[in-house]
Amino acid sequence: MFDTVCTLPLSADLFSQALHPKEPVVSVGLSSGHVQTFRLPSDEVDSDDDGASTSSSRTGRGHIDTMWRTRRHKGSCRCLGFGVDGEMLYSAGTDGLVKAAKAETGVVENKIAIPLDKNGSVDAPTIIHALSPQTLLLATDSSALHLYDLRIPYSKVSARPEQSHHPHDDYISSLTPLPPSDTSTSGFSKQWVTTGGTTLAVTDLRRGVLVRSEDQEEELVSSVYIDGLPSSGTSRGAKVVVGGSGGVLTLWEKGAWDDQDERVYVQRESGGGESLETLAVVPDDLGKGKMVAVGLGNGAVKFVRIGANRVVSEVMHDETEGVVGLGFDVEGRMVSGGGQIVKVWHEAVDSGDGVNGNETGGKRAFGDDSDEDSDDGDDDDDSGDSDQENKRGDARKKRKKGKTPKRGGGQAVMAFHDLD
């Protein structure tokens, strides 16, 4: 279904990945505290001397450019997220800080101190999400969900969230906004679904936590919203798809949040399946129908057709490291991240019905990163040695980090501009 365009090596383990909403740009947050932003080769069509049209990204002649790179956090960068218009990039780290930087340059414009936990210790972040130009959501290890009004000029001394909720007993593992209602005047979401521990919850911007599901007796780790499904009976044609730690996808009917209504076995294994770490909706023109890409803890990416509720294809991101980041850029290319690599994939030319057999990635590997700890293009003063990680929080959130990274060998190496 997908072929690899390129494999991009990183200087440390990937902890977070974010795709720009309007441009072919990907940002990564690393265990070392670095944040790096890349511009991917455009999928624009070029004509050669024979009049044949080819895409530079498909032929491998395009360049991946490093827009900027900096040591953003003293500790690991746990999570990243672009603003709704793509102008700002928000990062949060185990140093207890949220930083808002210009996406184009990496220059920090604002900092927010994360509230301490009840013991007075740093409450490490798990998720950051810009719900609208006005509202930033931040989840932490202590199960807190903080809401910040971005119109207020915060300082790291006086910053306080406008609201704080605890929708789950355990840390929040995923957050998926629900689309605005038909009567919305702003056009931005005001409700969102979260997973944490063994429950799913729905929270409203004004009314707080609305509902929490029954105990699912399985850890829920990822979620995504999908609409455009057939409507029949009580079905509204929209569902939230949730990935579990035991290899099972559960489908939740929108508005019926007490319990799941369908199950899809993605990875069956004796003693329990692989954790479904991250989910992404496949664009309709690529998926040949409603489809969800599932990043697994064993490094595979599987494609599940919703409706038929079965796995139809699979590719391999990495043989030893789990998939941490997964999404589709504005040009429809899949971007997967995990371990110390990011891979960019395009639709296979011979994909036909959208289903290929087991494909392995890494057809082209671009040149390695020189990984100098420079802050070029950034006026932030983040420097010095890394503080010790919050070992408990990182080990809990990144269950696959104990594995030894395995770098692929024997791959062709292609040079490109401005990697560092």
UniProtKB/Swiss-Prot annotation:
Species name: Aspergillus terreus (strain NIH 2624 / FGSC A1156)
Protein name: WD repeat-containing protein jip5
Keyword Transferase: no
Composition skew (Basic residues), residue ranges: 394-406
Acidic residues: compositionally biased ranges: 368-387
Superkingdom as given in the UniProt entry: Eukaryota
Family stated for the protein in its record: Belongs to the WD repeat WDR55 family.
Stretch list, region Disordered: 39-63, 350-420
WD repeats: 9-48, 72-111, 117-158, 221-262, 271-314, 318-355
Signal sequence range: none
Keyword tags: Nucleus, Repeat, WD repeat
Main location as per UniProt: nucleus
Subcellular location: Nucleus, Nucleolus
InterPro entries, alphabetized: WD40/YVTN_repeat-like_dom_sf, WD40_repeat_dom_sf, WDR55_POC1
GO cellular component terms, A-Z: nucleolus
